[in-house]
Amino acid sequence: MFRLLKNGDVYAPEHIGKSDILICNDKIVDIAEHIDFDYPGTEVVDLEGRKVIPGVIDQHIHVTGGGGESGFTSKVTEVGLSDLVRGGVCTVVGVLGTDSISRNVESLLAKVKALNEEGLTAYCYTGSYDYPSPTVTGSVGRDIALIDEVIGVKICISDHRYAGITRKELTKLAAAARVAGLVGKKPGVVHIHMGAGKKGLKDVFKIIEKTDIPVKTFRPTHAKNNLK
């Protein structure tokens, strides 16, 4: 199936201006100032006055819903495919948050699989704020290495909701994620929820200083919570 997008203001990602885009099935085959293409059955869409950008990659979405810190009625419902597409998101990484009591990694993985079936590109992290990390297989390393959609582990530090993980335990968690990533040919990252606590990223910096674990293993998020 061919689709020809005409007259869009295109960013690829640099701004190239008014252009046409020819798509065959799920592949972009040409971008040019003007494309003449009249293959029978081609769908032509006029994008005059609209911007065209690459799909957004969002590495932190609570696809099964966030919230839940003000009782069960505060739980946010899970995200739908249309919510993501309307926001221009084409790739997501699903995460658990504070609540790993009424939510779990299994339901997160199932939601990610569903999004993939619907045509999105979706991954997830095993683990949550809790420690020891909740997993599917009983092991962070096995989850990352053996489950296609799992590319790392989520943890929380320096936050009143964190599970008391020590620097030594965080080092072991990062080492497990690193090795599993190598085995499974995955990023093998530790996705860290950063709170506004006193220690900030000190433990992470110490691990980087004192061990051989690569800095790219650590992916802090919500860093604005602690700018000291």
Regions found by a protein language model. Give the residues of each.
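Hydrophobic faces of well-ordered beta-strands that scaffold small-molecule active sites
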Residues: G55-Q59, V92-G94, A122-T126, I151-I157, ...
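Active-site mouth loops of central-metabolism enzymes
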Residues: H62-K75, T126-P132, H160-G164
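Active-site environment of divalent metal-dependent phosphoester hydrolases
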Residues: T64, T98-R103, D130-P132, A196-K202, ...
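Metal-associated gating/positioning segment near the N- to mid-region
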Residues: F37, L47-A110
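Active-site gating/metal-coordination segments in enzymes
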Residues: P132-V189
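Histidine-rich, glycine-flanked metal-binding segment
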Residues: M1-L4, V10-I53
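Divalent metal-coordination and catalytic microenvironments
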Residues: G8, I21, D26, G49, ...
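Active-site core of metal-dependent hydrolases
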Residues: R161, E169, A175-K228
